A protein has these predicted regions:
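PLD/PLD-like phosphodiesterase catalytic module centered on the HKD motif
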Residues: 1-307
């Protein structure tokens, strides 16, 4: 039986019931991504999920992933990055999430992720974008296990350097991936940890024709109604029974949980973006208490109703 959720109800189910198995068998460590979660929200008849160290098997019981990291503990630093490639007969989605990849490379990235959608174009020779993608993965010792040349990487949206926090420079690794100075057609959803209340997401994402929907403010403060509002589901400090973070100054605080949706009018697409960032040493969680960072970019899915 299909379930329908509001945005708020969905996030509560994901966060609070995931461990109980009510919706998903939700277990994740620093190195593993749950395939069931991806299958649930990226549903497509010909969906394939290629993950770094898949935790659960696919729907057929067979693990499918195209890359793996050679050295998880390079020079004493845990490998924290999640690279996920999702392919269907129509598009390829390359999702990158970085948090302290090693002790020596872009360790100040905080909690950025990038969702890149690439249309399928049939078999073609490698172009500049496939070359950069391979260079990017090679830079992080990601060993490819299949070919990506059948996707039209030339049509990739190139504007990825968006709202990087002042004093943090991790753009060099992305310049290998694509030329950010050239405007091309395509789609990309970019989320960085520096987005703050009151910022114009449409302008930041450089989306011309779209509407942006925001989650309701749990505190119901009327003065925040016109701002970009985030939900802080775990905002209550049990010791003091007070909120940990003040929403009015959230841009100066560690982001704990945020969610918003972006709806495109041309082409007709909709994204539900869920992320969390507890920037302490347990940001990525444990097997018993998983990190919420597994909810990356979720494509709009007619199977579910996120009204």
């Amino acid at each position: 039986m299909e379930k329908s959720f509001t945005c708020d109800a969905l996030s509560r189910e994901l966060i609070f019931n995931g461990l109980k198995g009510d919706i998903i068998d939700y277990v994740i460590s620093s190195y593993k991504v749950n395939v069931k979660l991806i299958y649930l929200y990226f549903y497509h008849p010909n969906l394939q999920v290629h993950c770094h160290e898949v935790l659960e098997g696919t729907s057929t019981g067979k693990e499918t992933f195209i890359y793996e990291h050679k050295d998880k503990f390079q020079k004493g630093g845990k490998y924290h990055a999640k690279f996920i490639l999702i392919t269907t007969t129509e598009v390829c989605r390359f999702i990158v999430m970085t948090t302290n990849i090693t002790n020596i490379t872009i360790q100040n990235c905080l909690n950025d992720y990038y969702v890149i959608t690439v249309p399928k174009c049939g078999l073609k020779a490698p172009n500049v974008f496939t070359t950069r993608l391979y260079q990017f993965l090679d830079a992080y010792s990601i060993r490819l296990k299949s070919c990506l040349n059948q996707y039209d990487w030339y049509g990739l949206e190139a504007n990825l350097l968006v709202s990087i926090p002042q004093g943090i420079n991790h753009s060099m690794c992305w310049r290998m991936l694509m030329n950010t100075n050239k405007k091309v057609q395509g789609s990309a959803v970019i989320r960085t940890s520096s987005l703050a209340l009151g910022w114009d997401i449409k302008k930041i994402l450089r989306i011309q024709q779209c509407t942006v929907e925001y989650a309701k403010d749990y505190t119901k403060r009327p003065e925040l109604q016109d701002l970009i509002l985030y939900n802080f589901d775990n905002n209550l400090d049990k010791k003091t029974n007070k909120n940990k973070y003040d929403l009015r100054s959230v841009e100066m605080k560690p982001f704990h949980y945020k969610r918003y949706t972006i709806e495109y009018t041309k082409p007709n697409k909709r994204w539900l973006i869920i992320t969390s960032a507890n920037l302490g040493k347990s940001a990525w969680g444990t097997l018993k208490w998983p990190s919420l960072n597994a909810e990356l970019g979720i494509t709009w899915n007619s199977k579910f109703n996120f009204n």
